[in-house]
C-alpha cells in the first residue's frame, strides 16, 4: 500500500513534470508565431494602404483634370454662343441696311429724272447712258430667266431684283449658300435646290465651248445658269452636274445631260429627275437622323477615344451615307479617294456600341462593320469621292460662322489613361495582395509544422529517461 501510494505520488509528480515541461518550452514558440503574424498583418496593411493611396491620388488627379476640361469646354461654348449672337446681330443690321437701300433705290426710280425724261423723248445723252449704267449695276448679278422677257423696260429691274432669292414665279426660294464647296462652283455662286420647277425653267449653260462659239461669232454671250452651282439640301457636296452626268437613271428615269441641256426640252422629265434626286436626299437625311438618335441614346460619354469624337463620326457617316445613295464621281475635289473607303473611315472613327443584351457578349467588335470591300478589286469604274481628311484641313472658314473644326472636347492624356487604368490598377493591386498573403501564410504554416515535429522527440526522450 505504501509502495503503491508512493508510486501513485510518483506518477502524479511525473505527470505534473510531463505536463509542465512542454508548457515552458511552448511559450517561446507561441510568442514567435504571434510576432510573425503581427508582422505579416502590419506588412500587408502597409502595402494595401500604399496601393490604395496611390490609386486614390491617381483617380483624384484624373477627376480634377476632367473637371478642368469640362469647364474649359463650357467656356468655349459660351464664347461661341456669344460670337453667334454678335454675328446674328450684325447680319440683321446688314439686312436692315440693304432693305433701306432698296427702298431708297425704288423711290429714286419712281421719281422722274432728267436723263429718264430725255431717254423717253428719244434723245440719247451721255447723262442718260450713265444713268442706265448706274441702274444696271444696282441690280443683282444673277442671270435672268428666259420666261421673264416681255413687258416694259421699267419692269425688268424689278424682275431681276426679285430673282435674288426666288427663281421664276415659284414660292419656294433657292437659298444662296454662305460659301461654295472647296473648288466648287465655277461662277462662285452656290444655290440649294428647293423647287424643281424653278430649276428646270432656267437657261442652262453647255460649258466653255458654247461661250467660245458665241465669242467667235461676235455675239455677246448671254448669262446662263451652270449646273455645278446647284447643290442638294442635305448631301450638299453633290451638284446637279455630277448627278446628271453620273446618276442618269434614278427610279428608271432618263436623266442624262442631253435631256436637261436641250433648249426648249420637256420640263416634265427634268422636274421628275430633280424630284427623284430630292427623294434620295430626304431618305439619306432620315437615316442620318436615326443614326444621331442611336448615338444620343447609347453613347454614355463623348470621351470614347483620344483621336476621335462624335462630331468626326457624324461627318464621315454622312459622307458614307450620301455616297451610298448617290454613286457618282465628284469632280470639285482637291483630292479624291474611292467612295468605298468612307466605310473604313466610319468604322475607325465611330464608337463601339454594344447591344443591350447581357446574354450575348461581343468581344471587341464594332457596331459598324464594313463588308464586301475585299471581295472585288477596285477598278477604274469605281466612283471616286472627295477626301474628307484633306477637305477638313484645308477648307476655308465660312463668313459669318464659327469655326467648329475644334469643337470636339479633347481630353488630356492623364484623363483618358486614368479612366482606363483606375479599375485595372485596383484589380492588379488586390491580386498582388492576395498572392502575397497566401505565400506568407504558407511559409508560416511550414515553420509551425517543422517546430512541432522537432519538439515531439524531446518529449518522448524525457519520458523514457524518467522511466
UniProtKB/Swiss-Prot annotation:
GO terms for cellular component: plasma membrane. The keyword tRNA processing does not apply. Keywords: Cell membrane, Disulfide bond, Glycoprotein, Membrane, Transmembrane, Transmembrane helix. Disulfide bonds join 200-270, 235-322, 255-270, 313-350, 333-386, 339-385, 343-370. It is found in: Cell membrane. It is a multi-pass membrane protein. PANTHER family: NALCN CHANNEL AUXILIARY FACTOR 1 (PTHR15819:SF9), TRANSMEMBRANE PROTEIN FAM155 (PTHR15819). This is NALCN channel auxiliary factor 1. It comes from Mus musculus (Mouse).
